[in-house]
């Protein structure tokens, strides 16, 4: 089930973590003081919140082979960097130290916790497309998407009450990735894929932007993790990057630090925010460029920290 990943997918992973950092950066800035920057904030969420879904789609597309030893190694590396980050920022409270010692169980990072539990389920999840016919597999995905994406997107009710940041959503997207790998492995028209992506982002932006304007505060329902438009856009992104075919040792090596960047994000931001204050620039037209530089700085510092410790976090392709 495992396949060698060329640099097109590794580049996608780098862009995904960059997008997540951009959202985290804008999330800490009060953009309400500027209509322009509020719109930029909505646009950032509309585009980059596809990052998490793309990560899970990639896991499903290539399939996870459960390996308990590698999972333990992953856990130990995450514990090391979490404890390092907790101590480095001076958070020496008993509760914080205990949580940092058990980051997976304590849901210190929701994505990593859910990913761990997903790994334990994959020996069974991987049998679903093997046991079900294509028609029944499509029916299963349709029901899952209806219950846990379509209905929550349009605000009727949300069964899981987690905004898509939970195990049920991750299982659903993983299975969708398996479906794409098995039944959509042919070449697609890139023009149509771009159109689908553009329409998805456009609807999310217009809907959330309009509601933000009417309600007077940032509205994020249509760009949430469980949004059907985010899921559709993420599928378009995955299929677009699959059409690329190139190899870069630099990109492949850099992509190996993606998980470390995610884990160290909070720690690096805590240090940087001691010297960087975005508040004076919240109304400036160049705020987005400052945010881009800030996100890139976090990625570089996190990667250098990993290199300095001579430790590497195994990527999800290794589990």
What are the language-model segments listed below?
Residues 156, 160, 167-170, 187-252, ...:
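Alpha-helical transmembrane segments and terminal signal-anchor/GPI-anchor hydrophobic tails
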Residues 49-65, 111-126, 154-187, 226-246, ...:
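Specific transmembrane alpha-helix
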């Amino acid at each position: 089930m495992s396949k060698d990943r060329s640099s097109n997918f590794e580049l996608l992973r780098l862009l995904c973590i960059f997008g997540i950092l951009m959202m985290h950066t804008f999330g800490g800035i009060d953009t309400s003081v500027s209509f322009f920057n509020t719109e930029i904030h909505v646009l950032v969420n509309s585009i980059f919140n596809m990052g998490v879904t793309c990560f899970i789609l990639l896991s499903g597309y290539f399939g996870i082979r459960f390996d308990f030893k590698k999972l333990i190694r992953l856990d130990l590396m995450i514990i090391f960097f979490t404890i390092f980050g907790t101590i480095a920022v001076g958070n020496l409270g008993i509760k914080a130290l205990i949580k940092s010692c058990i980051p997976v169980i304590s849901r210190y990072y929701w994505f990593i916790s859910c990913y761990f539990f997903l790994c334990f389920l994959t020996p069974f999840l991987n049998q679903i497309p093997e046991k079900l016919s294509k028609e029944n597999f499509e029916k299963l995905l349709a029901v899952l998407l209806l219950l846990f994406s379509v209905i929550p997107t349009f605000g009727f009710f949300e069964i899981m009450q987690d905004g898509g940041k939970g195990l049920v959503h991750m299982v659903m997207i993983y299975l969708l990735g398996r479906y794409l790998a098995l039944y959509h492995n042919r070449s697609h028209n890139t023009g149509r894929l771009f159109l689908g992506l553009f329409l998805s982002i456009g609807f999310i932006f217009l809907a959330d932007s309009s509601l933000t304007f009417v309600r007077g505060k940032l509205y994020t329902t249509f760009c949430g993790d469980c949004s059907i438009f985010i899921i559709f856009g993420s599928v378009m992104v995955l299929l677009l990057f699959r059409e690329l075919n190139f190899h870069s040792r630099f990109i492949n090596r850099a992509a190996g630090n993606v998980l470390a960047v995610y884990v160290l994000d909070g720690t690096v931001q805590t240090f940087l925010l001691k010297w960087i204050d975005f508040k004076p620039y919240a109304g400036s037209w160049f705020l987005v460029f400052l945010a881009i530089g800030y996100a890139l700085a976090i990625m570089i510092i996190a990667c250098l920290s990993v290199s300095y410790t001579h430790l590497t976090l195994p990527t999800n392709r290794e589990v």
